[in-house]
Design a protein with these regions (language model features):
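Active-site core of glycosidic bond-cleaving carbohydrate-active enzymes
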Residues: 99-101, 107-150, 156, 166-170
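Glycine/tryptophan-enriched, flexible segments
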Residues: 1-123
């Protein structure tokens, strides 16, 4: 995170974000007006998604701006046709809006099932990794010292900035759960302390999904190499 990158110069979102409503509105406008153009294309690219992701999650989770506000701002622009040559923006923002719907879904899921913070959604997977957790592996993962460059870079960046793109978050969890056999509750508690945009409903559902203990989602193992 300390190394300057030519692709990150003059970016409007920034690696480490400031808080507050004024900053939140600034980030919202820059995303709707410009940065969303490559939202889908760069979703899995850690180098570029720093800027093309919405970067609104910290403001949403801290109540600085609301989902309704984001949707309304998007609708205003869509109705006025933004400007010429904005089809890409509309398509990408529509995809982002669908993720806002999923955000609400997961928050409601935790409210309906508050025990998903502590228990696997499918009881057959409860405690499946309890006897395998290697403390050395766990500490190496927490410190970003596993020896796998992309994993370590993501963890160190998260420690430094409090934020990661979605796919990189998923990879960190997948690596901990499948490669190191760390119980998702242990890794989940640690990650929760690092995210500046920590949202319990999203966090614990994703921890379980990326660890393969829901019983309904496909097993996703990210290649760290």
């Amino acid at each position: 995170p300390d190394k300057k990158n030519k692709f990150l110069k003059n970016k409007s979102a920034g690696i480490t974000q400031k808080g507050g409503r004024i900053e939140g509105l600034k980030i919202l406008n820059s995303f709707l007006n410009e940065r969303s153009k490559y939202y889908l294309k760069n979703l899995s690219k850690p180098e570029y998604s720093i800027d093309s992701s919405s970067r609104l999650s910290p403001f949403l989770s801290n109540g600085v701006i609301s989902v309704k506000e984001i949707i309304n701002e998007y609708r205003k622009r869509k109705e006025s046709n933004f400007s010429s040559n904005t089809k890409g923006l509309i398509r990408n923002i529509s995809a982002f809006n669908s993720r806002l719907s999923w955000r609400c879904h997961f928050i409601q899921k935790l409210e309906d099932q508050p025990d998903i913070e502590f228990k696997s959604m499918h009881s057959a997977y409860e405690g499946i990794r309890d006897n395998f957790t290697n403390e050395f592996f766990f500490e190496s993962w927490m410190e970003g010292k596993t020896g796998f460059p992309i994993v370590d870079a993501c963890m160190r960046s998260l420690i430094k900035t409090g934020w990661l793109p979605f796919r990189m978050r998923a990879m960190l969890v997948s690596f901990a759960s499948y490669n190191l056999l760390i119980d998702w509750k242990k890794s989940g508690t640690y990650l929760a302390k690092l995210f500046t945009d920590f949202e319990p409903g999203i966090h614990y559902s994703q921890m379980q999904m990326q660890s393969g203990v829901t019983g309904i989602n496909a097993v996703r193992i990210y290649n760290p190499v």
